[in-house]
Amino acid sequence: MRTAAVLLALVGLAAAAGPASAQPSTAFPWPGGARAAVVLTYDDGMDTHLDHAAPDLEAAGLRGTFYVPGHSESLARRLPEWRALAARGHELGNHAIFHPCLRQNAKGERRDWVQPEYLLESYTVRRIHDEVLAMNTTLLALDGEQVRTFAYNCCDTTAGGVSYIDALRPLFLAARGGEDRLAADVRGLDPMLVPSWAATEVGGEKLIAFAREALDKGGLAVFQFHGIGGEWIPVSREAHQQLLAWLAQNRASVWTDTFRQVMAHVVAEQKRGAAQR
């Protein structure tokens, strides 16, 4: 398990290092001569993450980021297994306590499943800040980590009509948003608003195509998964395994790691570039 000190040292080392010699000067310098990066994230703390996603990741020699809300039933029932998952090198990320969301998504579609008590329309920035801060303490008790990342619930970034992105900035190394796209301009990326693709009921070929796009553009592809082989907003286990197999086969050119590890490198490179200007 990586400590906060190790991560901060990683940031310092990455900032001091120059771009890989194999990379063109205009390309973002990924570690080990890789030409792109991929992050695999899993939302909502589900049983299928413990039963399917994590074992399949480990079989492929990969690690993922699991965004667990405090009210997750799986977390309550299987807490020792979630602690063990973190001990095996996976990241536990903050997904608030009560998974608050807006009533309507960006497309104007209603989310009738959101309880009235947890509508972001009725939250204040202070309330979401304090809820997320409390969840950080819960996660600290689980894995001992001080450096944390966040995933905006439902990819929503406002509380009571006011953006809460900047209010969370002091609490996190980085935060995952939505937009169903990759980050092609990594140097100009806001670490607190990293785009991701919410993959739902798609096959392995389409999942791999998203990773290939990152490779073609030298960018960062963040996958946003929910259920794996079951539960809600699912992707089949077979499709998930096909993606993992492709990533394992292409590990020399595509760096796949946790959101925390990848964003520690991105932030370090951004700081190094700013210091040179």
Over which residues does each language-model region extend?
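Boundary/entry segment of secreted carbohydrate-active catalytic domains
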Residues: 23-51, 196-197
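Active-site metal-binding loops of divalent metal-dependent hydrolases
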Residues: 42-45, 96, 227, 259
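C-terminal domain-boundary segment and adjacent tail
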Residues: 24-32, 64, 74, 140, ...
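Boundary at the C-terminal end of the N-terminal hydrophobic targeting segment
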Residues: 16-24
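Bacterial N-terminal signal peptides
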Residues: 5-16
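Metal-dependent polysaccharide deacetylase catalytic core of the NodB/CE4 family, i.e.
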Residues: 36-38, 58-162, 170, 179-193, ...
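Solvent-exposed, polar/charged alpha-helical surfaces in well-ordered, non-transmembrane soluble domains
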Residues: 51, 55, 83, 126, ...
